[in-house]
Amino acid sequence: LIKNTKKPQSLTYYLFLTQLKKTLPKNRFTVLCPLQCNSGITYGCQNNGTILIYRQEEWFKVVIHETFHSLCLDFNSMHLEEINQKFKRELINVNSDLNLFESYTEFWATLLHSVYCAYTFTKDKVDEKSFLLYLDFILHYEKIFSLFQCVKVLDYMGLTYRNLIQGDEISKSLRNLHYKEDTNVFAYYVIKCVLIYYKEEFLLWCDKNNGNTIFNFKKTNNSLFSFLEFLKHHFRKDGLIEDTEKSLSFFNSFIKRYTYPLRNVLTKTMRMTIIDVD
């Protein structure tokens, strides 16, 4: 299934399923870091791989994510300085390491986890129609949730999606002043949102560019720059911009309408997926 020259000889998983949740800090001056955003760790493309998962929250989705890194299915092993500079020069200049491979990996982790959930929810395992209905339902809500998480994280920093994509001096100043991260926030919550929002188009891109295995990123510079072109083409599309504004409006109305603890469940969580199975 996976044709890769850097498959590990062994892969060991350590699961410490703590009850610690990923949540926004109470103090808006706190820079988002692994405490709020991360649930696992690994080193990609190692001969003897090790994966550590340290939260129960989203644990299986995180297993998929970290396994992608370990099996070298993304492009974390490539030299990314040029593509990062090109991204900041031609698309959005933010104070971020970018790590675009994290967005690619999180997209596929979300998609494959959704497939797993849909299969689990389908009572008759050979009922393809029911499975596809569940999958369509799940992916629809993951798209909505990704939009919500994107605008919520930006709002926490005092930014909107338009502040990110516009090239006027005010927007540039706001980005330079307000956008800060100590982990892959931009990759997890912003770029991943774009990929999930345009998942059909991105799946076609993967099918065209990745060869025989659709999720195994073809590790060439041409593929890297093609990936960047995909992002450039979709980041500023009207449909995405309009839906981020609708999500922001819903976020603000939700805060006003509901009180603790219900309000905090949705407005504070830093989960990256909303659908799960016990």
What are these model-derived regions, one by one?
Residues 52-61, 94-98, 102:
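Amphipathic alpha-helical protein-protein interaction segments
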Residues 61-74, 109:
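Active-site recognition of the HExxH zinc-binding catalytic motif
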Residues 125-278:
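Long, compositionally biased intrinsically disordered regions
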Residues 1-47, 53-57:
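Auxiliary, metal-adjacent structural segments of Zn-dependent hydrolase domains
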Residues 26-46, 68, 72-94:
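Short, flexible helix-coil linker/hinge segments at the edges of structured domains or between repeats
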Residues 4, 19, 69, 73-77, ...:
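Short amphipathic alpha-helical interaction elements and helix-loop-helix interfaces
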